[in-house]
Amino acid sequence: MKVDNVKSQMRKGMLEYCIMLLLHKEPAYASDIIIQKLKEAQLIVVEGTLYPLLTRLKNDDLLSYEWVESTQGPPRKYYKLTEQGEVFLGELEISWKELNDTVNHIANR
């Protein structure tokens, strides 16, 4: 098994959580999420991965979106967390802290 494969799977597993964290801070246009924020965090994502994930989160009532006129080109779809999304994110944060604590405990034995 290659290390790169494991690292890739770990990143994919955290993608939903990271997107929700970004949208908790402010609504975002999908390309902003792809090009800037996730890339800066070394979570490289292609549109074929991001858009189905955003759609699933929206269908689960965790995200909503609104169309905003653009100064260049067509209107843009800005995503934001719903109230239910905020609650779900809180649950994910608890799970992340528990998982992180567990890994740190094992690593420091």
How would you describe each model-predicted region?
Residues 7-49:
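N-terminal helix-turn-helix DNA-binding core of bacterial DNA-binding proteins
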Residues 71, 75-93:
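Basic, amphipathic "hinge/linker" alpha-helix immediately C-terminal to the N-terminal HTH DNA-binding motif
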